[in-house]
Regions:
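A helix-boundary/kink motif common to multi-pass secondary transporters
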Residues: 104, 166, 295-296, 323
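Generic hydrophobic alpha-helical scaffold/packing signal
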Residues: 208, 234, 256-259, 266, ...
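Long, low-complexity, intrinsically disordered cytosolic termini of multi-pass membrane proteins
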Residues: 297, 349-379
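Cytosolic, membrane-interface loops and tails of multi-pass inner-membrane proteins
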Residues: 28-53, 266-298
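Alpha-helical transmembrane segments of integral membrane proteins
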Residues: 292-310, 316-319
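"…together with the soluble PPM/PP2C metallo-phosphatase catalytic core" -> "…together
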Residues: 1-262
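Extracellular/periplasmic helix-loop-helix junctions in multi-pass membrane proteins
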Residues: 313-331
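Membrane-interface capping segments at transmembrane-helix boundaries
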Residues: 28-31, 340-355
């Protein structure tokens, strides 16, 4: 594993600049949050804090990130980077308004799609996916007209997935920093200068805010920060990961963002199995499970940091090792995921899902019998 030494200086400066600006801006943003009433008041059992805490910390992260980008990334003749930053500004403005007055979910979703379309229509798009079937003669799936909708789905999905894991002090911020650091390492290995500097700025901005966000948190980053981090991670992963053609390239971004992706997927499946809306808020996320298993907030967050770090390290191995080693690693990770799911999803939940499926099956049988009776009566 070798890094491009010429990139180390700008990467280090970008990281340090974002860290300092983010750290210094947080008290300023905290004061602003109190003035505009952007305060998170615990109102239900999903909240893990017991006293009002100011939101809008994402503004400090955004300030640190932008300061570093404007200093170390030349965006003047770079329409792709311009489109990413424009979309990010829309996401941040949306987040600020939502943190202050709580916007309707449908409106937020529509605006997120608009923000995602900006980079998707300006070259930041998933053009092809590697075929996971290693026995197929076609190594890649060229998306053609599906490129834009799949790109928008990816960006909006990751944007919301990061927001959904923002349930414990420092969790989403730390996991995002680990994910960004992973992309940074891969970009350094592949000599992708722009991606490396942008990810360094994101890591620095996250780390600068982290002292205020770790348990017990003095400030939350709110939707402003969580959706911004998800947006940047999703768009930059397209720039730095999806465009590399390799048999296992489809797995790399999913590993790097594995924690928010799998937690969100399991949450939606669980809710639909219980007859609820996929967007219905509940206390079934992985961080809630760990708390219910007896861990305190710091232990739960540390556990998820380790999991995210292992996934990130696996992604680096996938990009640097041979294809045979990569496939073996993927198989091993799948086995670990199955075992972990049995631990994280306790017996009671499995029984609930089983009962729900039985009820649906019985309902189907009753409807079939009623239909048969109607048919016989007509005869």
């Amino acid at each position: 594993m070798r890094f491009d030494n010429q990139l180390m200086a700008p990467v280090a400066l970008a990281l340090l600049t974002a860290l300092v600006v983010s750290f210094l801006m947080t008290p300023v943003v905290k004061s602003f949050a109190y003035k505009v009433g952007a305060i998170d008041v615990p109102k239900d059992e999903r909240r893990m804090h017991h006293k009002p805490i100011p939101r809008l910390g994402g503004l400090a992260i955004f300030a640190g990130f932008m300061a570093s980008i404007l200093l170390f990334v030349d965006i003047r003749l770079n329409p792709q980077m311009q489109s990413i930053l424009l979309g990010a500004v829309i996401i941040v403005v949306l987040g600020v308004v939502d943190d202050i007055m709580a916007l309707p979910a449908k409106l937020k979703f529509v605006i997120q799609i608009v923000a995602a379309l900006i980079p998707a229509l300006n070259g930041v798009s998933i053009q092809a996916l590697s075929n996971p079937n290693i026995f197929s003669p076609n190594a890649y799936w060229v998306l053609n007209w599906l490129s834009v909708p799949i790109t928008v789905l990816w960006i909006v999905g990751i944007t919301n997935a990061v927001n959904l894991i923002d349930g414990l002090d420092g969790l989403a911020n730390g996991v995002s920093a680990i994910s960004a650091a992973t992309v940074l390492v891969i970009a350094l290995i592949c000599s992708e200068a722009q991606v490396a500097v942008v990810m360094a700025a994101l890591v620095g901005a996250c780390v600068g805010f982290l002292p205020y966000n770790l348990n017990p948190a003095k400030m939350f980053m709110g939707d402003t920060g969580a959706t911004f981090l998800g947006f940047i991670l999703s768009t930059m992963s397209i720039q730095g990961l999806f465009k590399f053609y390799a048999v296992i390239s489809f797995a790399v971004p999913f590993l790097i963002l594995g924690l928010p992706i799998f937690d969100t997927a399991f949450a939606m499946i669980r809710r639909m199995a219980h007859g609820q809306s996929p967007m219905h808020a509940d206390r079934g996320h992985i961080h809630h499970r760990l708390i219910d298993m007896g861990l305190n907030q710091k232990q739960a967050v540390a556990t998820l940091y380790v999991i995210s770090g292992i996934l990130g390290l696996s992604a680096v191995v996938l990009t640097t090792g041979g294809e045979a080693k990569a496939m073996l690693l993927l198989i091993a990770l799948c086995v670990v995921a199955v075992v972990a799911a049995r631990v994280v999803f306790p017996k009671e939940v499995k029984e609930e899902l089983h009962e729900e499926l039985e009820e649906l099956t019985e309902l189907g049988h009753h409807e079939e019998k009623d239909k048969q009776k109607e048919d016989s009566s007509h005869e």
